[in-house]
Amino acid sequence: MISNNRIFLVAIAVIGAVALSGLSVVAQQDDERPPMGVFITSVGVGNGANLGGLEGADAHCQRLASAAGAGDRTWRAYLSTQGPGAVNARDRIGDGPWANAVGLVMAANADSLHYDNSNFNWTYMRDENGNQFPSRIDGNPDFSEHDVLTGTQMDGAAFPAGDDRTCNNWTSDSGGSAMLGHADRYSFTTPGSSWNQAHPSRSCSQPDLVATGGAGRFYCFAID
């Protein structure tokens, strides 16, 4: 006859094996999860659209990514510039694919990103820490930070010289204007707004960015 003690020990061993198996699966899933390759900044630079040019914006991306444990990758801001030597945002973000901070692939490549075959929306867009951003569609209709600095047309190209759409190539915190995207893909409560070309900002100042539903945030992409 098998003793009760032996039955108990066998049961404990089985439970332990099942638990270890479960932990192994979780570890394997974590190992298979793609690394973060894109995020919306949790905070802006704090000086309106004066980001210190592309160099300053890239440095901000790198700092935030490093603080979130992703500093081993090279990060670039999704921003265009205008005028002589104009830069297209789509040309400075690598080839993809890009996953968010929780491992969901947001876009496979630049074409899927710019031709509306991506997961760029409020549900999936996260900051570098894996958090969502304030939006009117999250239950607080009076507060939103969905405006994102891009200075970019829907296809990822720079605007032609003329009307300022980059706040003097990201060096102005007063006069001028920047093209903004809607990170939640909503215009108030209406879906379908563009993530990178929704409307120009009132000006380049921090108060005006905040007044229309922003905080000086922008997108950051890993290029490697």
Task: List where the protein language model places each region.
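Bacterial N-terminal signal peptides
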Residues: 10-21
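Secreted/extracellular ectodomain signature
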Residues: 25-224
